[in-house]
Amino acid sequence: MAVLTLDYRCCDRKRPLYIKHIEVERIAATARQQLVADSIDAVSFDALRQISGLKINGIDFALEVSTDYAVHDEQGNHVFGVCEFDPAMPDAAMVSISPVGESLSELLALSTLAHELGHAVFDAPGWVVQGSKGPGLFDDIEPTMQRAYRTTTPDSEHLSKALSAKPTTEEHF
């Protein structure tokens, strides 16, 4: 089980701070170096699936990866994958990818898993920090609702570089 350790420029809420494409490429190269030897041509689906934890900008959290079950959005539509944070599990992010089948080829599954791991690297640290905050000095002691987060990859168009692709939406529950 692999734990990726990565750092990038971020704000005090642990969200990326003006990261350029070249910096994302450097971060991806650092992740690749931690997952496979230089002699390996490509990172495999299994290597990505075995990532069990992330340490991003000093924030440690577990990563649960599921590739066994079909994934659906809130409306019940089949989607390729999601990256989620549930405040009931404050030290973990979850990545779920629909299994290879009619609508998802092996290559699309690999691309979707890498894409959702990108959300785990760049979005989840902020979610974990936000989820760990308790009430402030002047807040009510009564339990308050905590926010869950989800990013969704609905289809292959979302993974394309085309300008027509819809941007990722972050959903709050």
Question: Residue locations for each model-derived region?
Answer:
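A generic helix-loop boundary/linker signal
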Residues: 18-21, 164, 168
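Post-HEXXH active-site segment of zinc metalloproteases
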Residues: 111, 122-166, 172
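Generic hydrophobic secondary-structure packing signal
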Residues: 24-27, 110, 170-173
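Short helix-to-loop capping/linker segments positioned immediately adjacent to catalytic or ligand/cofactor-binding
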Residues: 35-37, 101, 108, 162-165
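Polar/charged alpha-helical tracts
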Residues: 26-29, 46, 87-88, 139, ...
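A metal-dependent hydrolase signature that marks the N-terminal structural subdomain at the beginning
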Residues: 1-84
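Active-site scaffold of zinc-dependent metalloenzymes
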Residues: 61-113, 117-138
